[in-house]
């Protein structure tokens, strides 16, 4: 459900989502997406139904004052939206409950810095709360590719997958590490990309498996979608 809410929020136009899970984590994701420019309204008489009007562009942060992005205790919201917001413009402050401020996120932020995002950690190194100064992801800064370890979380990769269609050029992500944590969830992300008409290519090479996005105009609105979970 997180992925489809994000896709619909990034799309141009209006989408309808059905059977969206009802949870505090999803509430956090929706609230941040709306604060960044999307509009989400419950469908009358339908539990889990939402009409989503996209941002018509990129996530919009603050200019002088950062946009507050409170993830509470949702690690999924934190990891997916840190990448997505980095593809936007402006200042974003990502923070949450105390336990979230003990979870490192540096594997992802290193990749975002390589793509042009300024990251500043406010307290503990490599953990939220953190400040993003975003000007859109720029694959050309790093030769069109970044390397990402999969040992800690597959959601770093999913976040980049969701953010990549907003980039002005194809992005290749070279996957590394000794193991891939929760790889089936990457499959959910790829399925979401397919539903929204985003093309991609997966190649397997030793020792890692690069992935390349082929943006064809970015996110497009869906008339209707039913998230897998």
Tell what function each PLM region has:
Residues 1-229:
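Structural preference for solvent-exposed beta-strand-turn elements
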